[in-house]
Amino acid sequence: MTELVFILDRSGSMSGLESDTIGGFNSMLAKQKKESGEALVSTVLFDNESAVIHDRLPLEKVPPMTEKDYFTRGCTALLDAVGGAIHHIGNIHKYARREDVPEKTMFIITTDGCENASRRYDYEHVRRMIERQKERYGLEFLFLGANIDAAKEAARFGIGADRAVNYKCDEAGTALNYEVISEAVCSVRAARPLSADWKRRIDEDVQKRGR
């Protein structure tokens, strides 16, 4: 069993990429449903606030994302979204029977801008949470950022540069994002170590086309 937690930016700066984000996410889900093994899916969409549209649903029961779910507005309360999701999933794992805790848990965070609206969590709090989850429970975190220095921003969260990547925030870049995310998820679900070149295709796209 693998637990997948998607934390996706839908702030106003994502305007114009709604259909690309929805299509990329749904394509990724469709591919994952064809893979062997069980998985639970949580999806958090954030702007000024966070909206949980899937809360630990079995993968095969996750409905496609629609424009009623993903619409852009507001600012970027990234820390609140990440902190809230870790707190929620962490508490469930803490109080679950050992046999009910997924073997692997993976958080995938995408944003096209810096934090600017959180009220409940700050960087230090979230960094401590992430470092604790990685060290004690082996959780995996990926950070995909556009229009920012993704490695530098991820480091403030306690996420290493090897798990962070800058992407091109346009139609092609968004589609590639979800292809690469799907490949990374496949590796984790198959209990294979996530290789250092998981982000190679995104890096090459940015080198070719720029940020």
Task: Please state what every model-predicted region is.
Residues 1-211:
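Acidic, low-complexity intrinsically disordered regions
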